[in-house]
Amino acid sequence: MNYAYPDEKGHYGIYGGRYVPETLMQSVLELEEAYKEAMEDEAFQKELNHYLKTYVGRETPLYFAENMTEYCGGAKIYLKREDLNHTGAHKINNTIGQALLAVRMGKKKVVAETGAGQHGVATATVCALLGLECVIFMGEEDVRRQKLNVFRMELLGAKVESVAAGSGTLKDAVNEALRYWVSHVHDTHYIMGSVLGPHPFPQIVRDFQSVIGNETKKQYEALEGKLPEAVVACIGGGSNAMGMFYPFVHDEEVALYGVEAAGKGVHTEKHAATLTKGSVGVLHGSMMYLLQNEEGQIQEAHSISAGLDYPGVGPEHSLLKDIGRVSYHSITDDEALEAFQLLTKKEGIIPALESSHAVAYALKLAPQMKEDEGLVICLSGRGDKDVESIKRYMEEV
């Protein structure tokens, strides 16, 4: 398969690009230049790998979920344990890389958006480590859902700005973070949390997250002497999935499955299934599939999981859908909750609600596969942050 994206202008087929105001163009080009240089600099790579190993705690285990496998029948189920990273999710793979990039570029301050709070915590964490000032924008609704993560960020020295505009969720937080960046661009780096935004952000985030898929390949081959037949990951903006999928893109014998949030159901207005129900448009500097109405107004996304309710999806996922290399599906709030409880009871592992969407789809897929086949789930984060809201949700039902 001939797959080499993005092109030199930052496009993934028709997707991606740089739809930014003139005031940001210089910074985006400067970032691209700095990133290319860093990727070719052995000292930068050495420093990044040092932190990934000694600070983040990589590599993360590839765990054979024996009880889940027995319960499902069919394929052997493996979990890539990103929940065991420092700060409890995959997000830090990207924030440590970008923070080192910010230091390299001479920036003193970092701005970021966050939905579930995981990216905010991971950003505040690396800023504390590297002595950078940190400002985090978070939607009002997400602040309510994720009080503990807000307190964590503040403990780490970050200033958390609550965003009341719009639906008070991730989309609105990104808007405000971009506005802030425009007016502080001389001394501030924007750490985008997913494979979104203008080029080079989708590529930078994908490349820093590719450690997930690269490790998985190596670990699975060491255990089974081959590659897995299927790989499953959840998708909001799509960074854990892109990090897992990208190293497998050329291995056409490996089926790749992306799982979006169907919320209350894709037939309702309350979902975040962008690739299932969306259409092409531009948001936050990039062309991609979006949830929008006929006038092109962005619709609110809904999911029980704060990290999946973004109304767009990364440009590379948009392309991978169109060319059929990744198969995209969606899982409802109720199915994700069920999978959350099942994994907790069967394996003693409490997954994030985001990751529970991937687990739920894997539960449907595994029984359709043969016993000598393997299925890897990207367990993108741990569920501590969700326990309180799940308790509330279960009491209401």
From Swiss-Prot:
Its EC number is 4.2.1.20. It is an enzyme of class 4 (lyase). It catalyses: (1S,2R)-1-C-(indol-3-yl)glycerol 3-phosphate + L-serine = D-glyceraldehyde 3-phosphate + L-tryptophan + H2O. The keyword NADP does not apply. Pathway: Amino-acid biosynthesis; L-tryptophan biosynthesis; L-tryptophan from chorismate: step 5/5. The modification N6-(pyridoxal phosphate)lysine is found at K91. Keywords: Amino-acid biosynthesis, Aromatic amino acid biosynthesis, Lyase, Pyridoxal phosphate, Tryptophan biosynthesis. GO terms for molecular function: tryptophan synthase activity. The beta subunit is responsible for the synthesis of L-tryptophan from indole and L-serine. Tetramer of two alpha and two beta chains. This is Tryptophan synthase beta chain. The gene is trpB.
